[in-house]
Amino acid sequence: RRLVAGDLAGLFDGPSTVRFDPTLPMLSLDLSRVTENATLVSVLMTCASAWMESALLDPAGGQRWVVYDEAWRLMSHPALLRRMDAHWRLARHYGIANMLIFHKLSDLDNVGDQGSAMRALASSLLANADTRVVYRQESDQLGSTATALGLTGTEQQLLPTLGTGQALWRIKHRSFVAQHQLHPAELELFDTTGRMTSNDSAHLPSEEPSGGLS
């Protein structure tokens, strides 16, 4: 009813304004403008997943990475979580590698209730990851991160000391510290600090008048 006559009416009543082209080297679905509407996110991701699966089922589609940024947000929707689980189980059949991205592992606390089937399913996706890449963690996250990922004491102590672009790589039972380098073209695409580092002073507050409070 919401899709036909309610607040979501008109969004899915006609052809898409964007063509899903699986021949492109990379496709990104940006949900940043709808993240406050959980129902809309769920519907959009369901449609996008149907697009994606049609491309993955193409025998001539080659191999692909499927990247889930802010993964906890998608995992909070049961249907999407089950679809992600299917992609994990059928990864070899689809010719894909899956990547989950979290700010911190405690984000999983947003997925279902403690002890629920949803929480267990989300945790199993993490447990089935052969490669874990962990960037610097704050001290209040160290215990839960170490427990969830099975880190050694040395690895746990290393995490708060990592610098920008440095990460602990856990591959099976081996670990490495890597310094990641971005190509300028990659930095232009993925730099999320642009507004904080801009030299544009047009919107900066002027200096306080003499005697003003700060």
Q: What are the roles of these predicted feature ranges?
A:
Residues 1-96, 100, 158, 167-172:
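P-loop NTPase motor domains
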